[in-house]
Regions:
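Solvent-exposed alpha-helical segments within well-ordered globular domains of core cellular machineries
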Residues: 11-15, 29-33, 44, 48, ...
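Catalytic cores of large soluble enzymes that bind and process phosphate-bearing ligands
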Residues: 5, 38, 42, 118-122, ...
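Extended interfacial segments that mediate partner engagement and assembly in macromolecular machines
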Residues: 28, 77-143
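Long C-terminal interaction/binding lobes of large macromolecular proteins
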Residues: 39, 131-201
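Conserved, well-folded catalytic cores of nucleic-acid-processing
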Residues: 16, 20, 38, 53, ...
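Cys/His-rich Zn2+-binding cysteine-cluster or related metal-binding knuckle/ribbon modules and their
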Residues: 3-10, 19, 31-94
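Generic secondary-structure boundary/loop-capping signal
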Residues: 33, 72, 82-85, 91-94, ...
Length: 201
């Protein structure tokens, strides 16, 4: 039965918030009420920021990162090593590695992992651009910084096998990443240790 305090506008706001990661119906309701209660201090600036993001944030044509420019600030930074590419599942993992401040090369965002359950195959990932970069740029090493989940490791093996046809060293994160672990949930120290202890494949 529909609640007597139900309102279409509020219901829509709660529904949209509930679609964000980490939000369920109750937490979405609390967030919606907090926004409404603090309309001028929070809701209006948030709406303006969202509109600005829609207009200005783009996906980097080279690595798949997001920025206000394409190519992004990482790809165009002359101070970074152009000989290493760190392959990550998603942008959150890229950010986690950047926070660790131990990697000074380039990145490549796959946009997911291979997954039979979710019907995600090689053609669904950003693999062709990775191969194009290796063939077109002077890349010495590709570091596979993928999650230690079943799908993550399956993807790592597939990418390593694909890259074995090219003259590039392929390595993966070493100790420090627990089985089933995902990068964006790990602290900077753990990520730094895993990157420093990377192993050749």
């Amino acid at each position: 039965m529909k609640s007597r305090i139900s309102n279409p506008e509020i219901d829509k706001l709660i529904l949209l918030i509930s679609k964000l990661p980490g939000f369920g119906p109750k937490s979405a309701s609390r967030a919606a009420l907090h926004l409404i209660k603090n309309k001028e201090q929070l809701m209006v600036p948030l709406a303006e920021s969202l509109l600005s993001s829609i207009e200005n944030i783009v996906t980097c044509e080279i690595c798949g990162n997001i920025d206000v420019n394409s190519p992004c600030m990482i790809c165009t930074n002359e101070g970074r090593s152009k000989y290493q590419i760190c392959v990550v599942e998603n942008i959150a993992d890229l950010w986690a590695l950047e926070k660790s401040e131990v990697f000074n090369g380039l990145y490549h965002v796959l946009g997911g992992n291979l997954s039979a359950i979710n019907s995600i195959g090689p053609d669904d990932l950003n693999l062709k651009k990775l191969i194009d970069r290796i063939e077109g740029e002077k890349i010495d090493e590709v570091i596979l910084a993928l999650s230690a989940t079943v799908d993550g490791q399956t993807t790592a093996h597939y990418v390593a096998d694909t890259l074995s046809k090219h003259s590039v060293e392929v390595s993966r994160l070493g100790h420090g990443v627990p089985v089933g672990g995902e990068l964006d949930y790990m602290d900077e120290g753990t990520i730094a240790a895993a990157l420093s202890a990377r192993q050749k494949i």
